[in-house]
Design a protein with these regions (language model features):
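Non-catalytic, solvent-exposed segments at the cell envelope interface
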Residues: 2-17, 21-28, 34-346
Length: 346
């Protein structure tokens, strides 16, 4: 991800962007165009993002930290790439972005968690999907926002422990950072999932081949969503398709497959619409702008907007793997394969 092996990389075919990242880039691009950013802001954004010192600070047993940028792991040397930008992208299980901070401990959870690693030298981007059910240590704040303890629980709850806005993003960001051996993030963006329906309809609907893992036809609005059927989803159906899940040990894993399928289809539809009519970027922006929260300033947004246009993926979207089981209260708990996670980070 943000470290490199001391050997030539293998090139793969390009992959399309994920839904939260597409939304994020649409916002960045429109912001840059509408604000007519001058070169000085672009240079400031580049400087602040490319000098963040984002290398992981913790190493597992059997790994030797040789210096701030180099580790020896399983007999191979890995060196941190200095021009990486690491972003955390969060899909929030909420209809709307709160107009003001909520009391700590609100019910908004992080349903989608993605780590985006941008190599600004190689113009390559890597996405890593982290299950909401991942068991990890998260900070527990008191009524004033001060951290009063630590709980080992689902990653999704890190967001709900906060205020539904920036403090929730911070708590989720810190939990993922600790999970990823101290990896630091240059920015965070949250998308409130109530905007999925509006975005879906703004691109003219999204067609998927319905996967056979959930009884959609038994749910209001899912009358035509039969397994194996090609269906152009309405906004209501799109949200149902990417949010509904069974309550068993594999329910979230199956839902993540549907989310990935929908993301790819949505991106194809959005790209086709923008290619045929560049002005359609503005309606897409208007459709989702009220549902996005980010801590990136204008300079960083502008720099990322210009960089993202030429970036591609190498390989599939990666996933943090582990063993899922039902825990207390029939809650799904995913115990991470720590060795596989560190190999993934490398």
């Amino acid at each position: 991800m943000e470290q490199e092996k001391q050997e030539a990389p293998v090139q793969g075919k390009k992959k399309r962007l994920s839904t939260p990242l597409l939304i994020f880039i649409i916002l960045m691009a429109v912001t840059a165009v509408l604000c007519a950013i001058v070169a000085g802001i672009w240079l400031h954004g580049r400087s602040s993002l490319r000098n963040g010192g984002t290398a992981p600070t913790v190493t597992p047993g059997g790994t030797e930290q040789l210096d701030s940028y180099t580790v020896l792991h399983d007999g191979k040397y890995y060196r941190y790439k200095e021009h990486m930008v690491n972003l955390l992208l969060i899909g929030v299980d909420s209809d709307n972005k709160p107009a003001a901070p909520l009391p700590y401990g609100s019910d908004n959870q992080a349903d989608v968690i993605l780590v985006a690693a941008l190599d600004t030298d190689a113009n390559k981007m890597t996405l890593i999907s982290v299950s909401r059910d991942t068991m990890c240590d998260i900070g527990v704040p008191d009524d004033t926002g001060e951290i009063s303890g630590v709980a080992h629980t689902q990653l999704a709850l890190s967001f709900s422990n906060g205020d539904g806005l920036y403090e929730s993003c911070r708590l989720c960001r810190e939990a993922v950072s600790q999970l990823f051996y101290g990896l630091q993030f240059d920015g965070c963006a949250a998308f409130y999932m109530g905007g999925i329906g509006r975005l879906n309809d703004a691109v003219g609907g999204v067609t998927v081949n319905v996967l056979d893992d959930y009884p959609f036809t038994n749910v209001p609005g899912g009358w035509n969503m039969y397994p194996g059927q090609n269906v152009t989803l309405t906004g209501q159906q799109a949200r149902l398709y990417i949010q509904a899940r069974r309550g068993d040990a594999t329910g979230n894993e199956d839902r993540m497959q549907r989310q990935k399928q929908y993301m790819l289809a949505l991106i194809g539809q959005a790209k086709a619409r923008v290619a045929s009519s560049p002005a359609s970027v503005l309606p897409l922006y208007n459709a989702v702008s009220d549902y996005v929260l980010t801590d990136l300033d204008l300079g960083k947004l502008t720099y990322l907007a210009t960089q993202a246009a030429g970036m591609s993926f190498s390989g599939d979207m990666l996933r943090v793997t582990g063993q899922a089981a039902l825990g207390d209260g029939n809650r799904v708990e995913l115990t991470v394969d720590q060795e596989a996670l560190y190999d993934l980070i490398l």
